[in-house]
C-alpha cells in the first residue's frame, strides 16, 4: 500500500504547527516526526484549539508535548492513564505509577508551556474516561494491540464512545497487519478490517482513512514482531542498518465518529 501524496493531506493550522515547532519538545521525539507526521495526522482527525481532547495512554508524552500547548489557552487536554491500583503489584504497577509521575513532572516543569493539563485514571477492564458526552476528540496511538492481547479492546472502545459528545471523533493510529490476526497473536500488529469492526461494534461510524503513516517497506514478519523495528529496536546490533532502512512500522490512521 503506497503512502498518500503529502500534497493531498490536510495541513496543520498555524497554532498546531507552532506547537510542533516548539523548542520545549524532546529532541529525540522531534527526530521521529518523519515517521509519525503529527501535523498531518492531527489535522486529519480535525483537531481544533477549542476542543476537549483526551489522549489514551500517552506514555512518555510524545504527543502530549504538542497537544497540551496547543490546547492550553482555549481548549482542554486530558491524559488518560491506567490506574496503577488496577495493575497487579510488582514491576507493572511500579511502571504505571512511574509513567504518570514523570508525565506530571514534565507538565509541572513548564507551566508556561503546558498550562494545567488534566489527568484521568482508568481501569482497563471497566474504563471510564470522564463525564459521558463531554469530549470532542479521543486519540489513541499504537495501543490497540495491547488491549487485544489483554482482552480489553471491547471495553475500551465502549468507553471512548460514552465519553465523546454526539458527533465527536475517535482518532486511531495503529500498527497494521497484512490481514486480521488471531486472538493469541503477539506480533503487535492488528488487521485494519479487524480494528474497524471493533470500533463499529461500539457504535462508531468510520469517517475516513489516511495513509499518512503508511510504510510499504515494513514486511511485518520479524522475530520480535513490531518491536524489532525502530524505536524499540529489539534486534541484534549487527542488524541496525537493516531495520533503520525500513523505519518505523506501517500504520493505519482511522477516523471514527460517534453517531
Where are these regions (language model features)?
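C-terminal lobe and adjacent flexible extensions of AdoMet/dcAdoMet transferase-like proteins
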Residues: 243-259
